């Protein structure tokens, strides 16, 4: 039987393991492990086996190991992890796709009952319907002001009732009622808090961004740059076309109001002197467009008319 490790030996072994993982992996998910049991954690480890490693530990030990690794290797990128090691957290080192690993972790959430004193992570609403409880159990509902009626010898909840609000502590009456109804309102599992990718740290929401989201954000950014550039008259690639158009309009306006002229301005001046030309141009365009098909139709009719054959051309008549 192997001798039991001392605390000092355990710390040395933990430091070595964490440093080795940081050498091998460049991507890490920082996860919250509140209310996650050992069996559940074991299942998560099995599910991620192959390209990911789950490491739990005390925050002080993890922070110390990260600093030791930075001092040994001169690589300070992992120091960005230290501010994230707060609360009941663990690390998932991975070589796989971060989004896929995050989705795999989310699969291992399990339902849990509402325990007394637990802070509710979500709102808990009891749905209307028959509870299957006998009338002697109505006291639970009365204490919680839940409207009920007796239907076929059992208690029936009339309307949906918000029993517990997110952030509130679960009371003894709420816990007892949910247990009687067989409702397990909460689900627990590892929750991704932050993502570390080769020195960069970002929110897990970034993993859910699609190509369309990125295109939309890029387009919005270009639009903002264009608006700002136009507002302060600072030339940028995005604003240049609009600046040229605005400048041309300004030059055209000056030419119209003065004797200065150029071919395009002459045309505008001509229209301004005789506005009726606008109407003539507008009528002429549709007429020309409709005239072309009519002419083409006539040409087709001419082509399709068969040449009439005469009896004389045949060299004899019907009465010969």
Swiss-Prot record:
Domain of life: Eukaryota
Database matches in InterPro entries: Ribosomal_protein_uL10, Ribosomal_uL10, Ribosomal_uL10-like_insert, Ribosomal_uL10-like_insert_sf, Ribosomal_uL10-like_sf, uL10_eukaryotes
One Pfam family matching this protein: Ribosomal_60s
Biological-process GO terms, alphabetical: cytoplasmic translation; ribosome biogenesis
Positions of the UniProt region annotated as Disordered: 291-320
GO MF: large ribosomal subunit rRNA binding; structural constituent of ribosome
Segments forming a coiled coil: none
This protein's GO CC annotations: cytosolic large ribosomal subunit
PTM characteristics: Phosphorylated.
Function: Ribosomal protein P0 is the functional equivalent of E.coli protein L10.
Subunit comment: P0 forms a pentameric complex by interaction with dimers of P1 and P2.
Homology family: Belongs to the universal ribosomal protein uL10 family.
PANTHER family to which the protein is assigned, alphabetical: 60S ACIDIC RIBOSOMAL PROTEIN P0, LARGE RIBOSOMAL SUBUNIT PROTEIN UL10
Name the record gives this protein: Large ribosomal subunit protein uL10
Species the sequence originates in: Glycine max (Soybean)
